[in-house]
From Swiss-Prot:
Region N-(5'-phosphoribosyl)anthranilate isomerase, annotated ranges: 254-448
Stretches the record annotates as Indole-3-glycerol phosphate synthase: 1-253
Catalytic activity, as annotated: N-(5-phospho-beta-D-ribosyl)anthranilate = 1-(2-carboxyphenylamino)-1-deoxy-D-ribulose 5-phosphate; 1-(2-carboxyphenylamino)-1-deoxy-D-ribulose 5-phosphate + H(+) = (1S,2R)-1-C-(indol-3-yl)glycerol 3-phosphate + CO2 + H2O
Biological source species: Helicobacter pylori (strain ATCC 700392 / 26695)
Protein name according to UniProt: Tryptophan biosynthesis protein TrpCF
Amino acid sequence: MPSVLENILKDKLLEVSDLKKNHALPININPSDRDFKKALLEKKTSFILECKKASPSKGLIRKDFDLLKITKTYEKFASCISVLADSKYFLGSYENIKIVSQHSTKPILCKDFIIDAFQIKLARMMGANAVLLMLSVLDDKNYLELFNLAKSLNMSVLTEVSNQQEIEHLLKLQYDIIGINNRDLHTLKTDINHTLKLRPLLPKDALIISESGIYSHAQIKALAPYVNGFLVGSSLMKEKDLKKACIKLILGENKVCGLTRIKDAKAVYKNHFIYGGLIFEKSSPRYIKPKEALKITKAVKKLDFVGVFVKDSIKKIQKIVKKLDLKAVQLYGYSQKEIAQLKKALPKTCAIWQVISVMSAKDLVPKTKEASLILYDTKGDKMGGNGVSFDWEILENVKTPFMLAGGLNLDNIQKALKVEALGLDFNSGLEISPGIKNKDKIKRLARILREY
């Protein structure tokens, strides 16, 4: 029985024949004027974000495939943009390259199963600045001919390898940028450990991109020390809110708590934090009345707001969640039974964050099954907002996703990032005074979160 790759290549011959019938190439094709490789080297870790409507493994991924909206979002986060050109299996086109190129300043990668010089010339004519060449598809002679053609058009070449044999082969040939594909193209299964296994076989100074199977910020942080960047498509394309998906993938799910002003909430959203915290505990210096909180949630609708509650009644929490359309509740001092009751009372769109106050390893009790997430905070005189941290090394063996809070600031952020939390929860460390955030500190923090 033919593999998926064999079927694709069989159909690709017919598709290339159709492309030649439907597109006339000019005698002289303008060379690429955007440096794909240079763009990948501008940050310590780069991202090639992909426009992908469908795939053989997942079928239709993004029904609302609005290229202009996708391009506009990627412009904020991508080092380069990849565009699928395969029509039958990915529902892409070479015309899509032109659309993205015309509406973006980023270098564009033509992603196709390239077997013919015509595809490279057409890709360049449409505005592509780089092409993907796959050693699983090409023999040495064809690979070198296509590689040299692309370079003659001033295009970068992303050469894809997927096993040791292909790497040994590549090292005898020419290469520009190397992509390690975590997907088996014959079975379509993915394994990100593939990158870790194959990276040591490649030269230390090679520019390496990890491709396929990248779904989370945790995976990014685990692989980032070994590669120069990532090519990500499916995990972003399947999400309705593409901007939020990009932020979660690249920066993690971070939060600024204790918001009391609209201007601070706007600064938090503008600097790509996912969550804004509103404290409804009256003893807190950052307490906010529900009617004042409503003004903030209405003014910054795209920020996901989390309500912080300390031993309040289920009825009160339910009322505030509904009124403010909170995306999560952060609970201090609630029993397993109370959390279970609250889960039944709240809409399914509202997550439950169970706070576990910690000072030593003996405080690391398991998450209540009804809670969506654990948030570890420092045990202190107050329920949160103590401004001190605990020994984060005790979290080393925690395997379930968690948020980290307690005394986080610009001085200890680098250490906190090594804890590998799902997200970090900042409060007093970003303030001028209780409840009044420092916009410059928020900006500086956002920059640090991207410095990996």
